[in-house]
């Protein structure tokens, strides 16, 4: 079958808006910057995901790892809210999943996190969110790359409450 230039142009003209909409849906949409925190929404697999994140203000114990690559993230997904994670910027050691290898302190509150690859996840997400709302900073301590030494990352919590409220408004809890 041979395509005429007119037919080819018509097909492109008809499909271009569909491609543009699909490309726009794949891009994150910023809900706002709230002091040290940013709130964003993203369509993923036909579902809306909202997350708030802050980058580490200080990182110690891992040479050549910029603090800006280390993030504390709270995510709302249709299948789970208040998912709290730290992206370390390196893979945790393989045996780091026994117990709570990463400890996060917020004021007087201690929170245990388990690890998988380059992330650490809160064991008690609700307690973590409550601590973040009431704290000034969160400090995570855990094993360094290849289990050598200890890494420490400090995240500012200024603006967390507003960023959390923004993602909660944009991705409200499902009614049961």
Describe the role of every protein-language-model region.
Residues 1-9:
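Bacterial N-terminal signal peptides that target proteins for export
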Residues 22-176:
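A generic "folded-domain core" signal
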Residues 8-17:
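Bacterial N-terminal signal peptides
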Residues 1-2, 20-23:
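Short, low-complexity disordered leader/linker segments with a strong preference
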């Amino acid at each position: 079958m041979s395509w005429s230039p007119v037919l080819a142009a018509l097909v492109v003209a008809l499909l271009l808006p569909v491609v543009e909409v699909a490309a726009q849906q794949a891009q994150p949409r910023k809900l706002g910057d709230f002091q040290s925190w940013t709130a964003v929404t993203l369509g993923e697999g036909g579902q809306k995901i909202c997350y708030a994140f802050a980058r580490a203000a200080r990182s110690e114990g891992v040479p050549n790892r910029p603090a800006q690559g280390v993030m504390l993230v709270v995510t709302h997904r249709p299948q789970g809210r208040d998912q709290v994670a730290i992206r370390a910027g390196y893979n945790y050691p393989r045996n780091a999943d026994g117990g709570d290898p990463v400890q996060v302190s917020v004021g007087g509150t201690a929170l245990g996190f388990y690890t998988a690859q380059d992330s650490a996840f809160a064991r008690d997400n609700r307690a973590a969110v409550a601590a973040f709302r009431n704290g000034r900073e969160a400090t995570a301590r855990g094993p360094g790359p290849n289990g050598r030494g200890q890494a420490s990352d400090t995240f500012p919590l200024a603006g967390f409450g507003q960023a959390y409220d923004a993602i909660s408004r944009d991705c409200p809890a499902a009614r049961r």
